[in-house]
């Protein structure tokens, strides 16, 4: 195991000839992608504490890639307790500049069925008490990601790849709730009928905010596991979520393994997020 308290000065400290420019964040059920060659575990102490688990660094189709399980192996952290800042900063310290995240979500519309993939293009934040920014002062920055919160180039690669293996929807609005409880019927009706959202989850925010604050590109492939609570006699349960993730895990790994080598290492439009953001 490699232990770090500062960004590595050379990729040789990790046992590779280049830094991992691509990062994968695994969601519920995806604690080890099982697609790496020459994998090494890296324990990273960040200014924001330890991430949810050690970062795994290895090669995928020749590219050096980093992987971090969002909840930690064994699902140690519920959504509202995930160390989001440490997670994102640990990947940034290793050289990651583009992130592909995987999440389980509920569907808020009938045509986004359990078992489908969704590659969202917008989100609504309904979380309440998380650490949302790296800029708590004395420097203040207001990032503008509203037009394209999810990086289009990453989205397109995920969509094209996922469609080969599974029914996949291009676009959708993800409403992120605080959790860890699921929605009430009244809340679910608001997300669907008032907000016009398409999928619901608990982990996108502040993960996406933090990545974009550091100039990182970000894309998400979401697996629909349930219909939230709005379909009669089909209320969501943790058991149902876990069961669907287990059924689709092999396909998710195939999509990641095929998509990752095609991803851009870095895009100027992502790194320029802070260009006019700080006051």
UniProtKB/Swiss-Prot annotation:
HAMAP family assigned: MTAP
Keywords: Glycosyltransferase, Purine salvage, Transferase
Catalytic activity as recorded in UniProt: S-methyl-5'-thioadenosine + phosphate = 5-(methylsulfanyl)-alpha-D-ribose 1-phosphate + adenine
Functional description taken from the UniProt entry: Catalyzes the reversible phosphorylation of S-methyl-5'-thioadenosine (MTA) to adenine and 5-methylthioribose-1-phosphate. Involved in the breakdown of MTA, a major by-product of polyamine biosynthesis. Responsible for the first step in the methionine salvage pathway after MTA has been generated from S-adenosylmethionine. Has broad substrate specificity with 6-aminopurine nucleosides as preferred substrates.
PANTHER family: S-METHYL-5'-THIOADENOSINE PHOSPHORYLASE
GO biological process: L-methionine salvage from methylthioadenosine; purine ribonucleoside salvage
Pfam families (UniProt xref): PNP_UDP_1
The keyword Transferase is assigned to this record: yes
Annotated source species: Pyrobaculum aerophilum (strain ATCC 51768 / DSM 7523 / JCM 9630 / CIP 104966 / NBRC 100827 / IM2)
GO cellular component terms, A-Z: cytosol
Site (Important for substrate specificity) location in chain: 183, 238
Annotated metabolic or biological route of this protein: Amino-acid biosynthesis; L-methionine biosynthesis via salvage pathway; S-methyl-5-thio-alpha-D-ribose 1-phosphate from S-methyl-5'-thioadenosine (phosphorylase route): step 1/1
Transmembrane segments: none
Class in the EC hierarchy, top level: transferase
Signal sequence, renumbered to the chain: none
Gene: mtnP
Residues that coordinate or bind phosphate: 28, 70-71, 103-104, 203
Name this polypeptide is given: S-methyl-5'-thioadenosine phosphorylase
Family membership noted in the UniProt record: Belongs to the PNP/MTAP phosphorylase family. MTAP subfamily.
Self-association state and partner proteins as the record states: Homohexamer. Dimer of a homotrimer.
Keyword Coiled coil among UniProt keywords: no
EC number: 2.4.2.28
GO terms for MF: S-methyl-5-thioadenosine phosphorylase activity
Residues involved in substrate binding: 202, 226-228
């Amino acid at each position: 195991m490699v232990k770090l308290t500062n960004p590595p000065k050379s990729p040789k400290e990790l046992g590779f000839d280049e830094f991992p420019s691509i990062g994968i964040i695994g969601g519920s059920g995806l604690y080890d992608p099982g697609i790496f060659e020459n994998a090494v575990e890296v324990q990273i102490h960040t200014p924001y504490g330890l991430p949810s688990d050690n970062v795994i660094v290895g090669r995928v189709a020749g590219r050096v890639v980093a992987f971090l399980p969002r909840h930690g192996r064994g699902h140690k952290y519920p959504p509202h307790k995930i160390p989001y800042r440490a997670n994102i900063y640990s990947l940034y310290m290793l050289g990651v500049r583009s992130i592909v995240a995987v999440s389980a979500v509920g569907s808020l519309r009938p045509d986004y069925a359990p078992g489908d993939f969704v590659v969202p293009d917008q989100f609504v934040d309904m979380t309440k008490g998380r650490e949302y920014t790296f800029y708590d002062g004395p420097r203040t920055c207001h990032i503008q990601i509203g037009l394209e919160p999810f990086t289009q180039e990453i989205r397109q690669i995920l969509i094209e790849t996922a469609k080969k293996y599974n029914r996949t929807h291009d676009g959708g609005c993800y409403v992120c709730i605080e959790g860890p409880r699921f929605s009430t019927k009244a809340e679910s009706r608001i997300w669907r009928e008032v907000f016009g959202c398409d999928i619901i989850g608990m982990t996108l925010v502040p993960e996406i905010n933090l990545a974009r604050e550091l100039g990182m590109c970000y894309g998400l492939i979401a697996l629909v596991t349930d219909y939230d609570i709005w379909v009669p006699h089909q209320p969501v349960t943790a058991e149902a979520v876990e069961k669907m993730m287990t059924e689709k895990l092999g396909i998710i790994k195939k999509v990641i393994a095929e998509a990752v080598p095609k991803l851009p290492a870095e895009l100027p439009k992502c790194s320029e997020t802070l260009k006019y953001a700080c006051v």
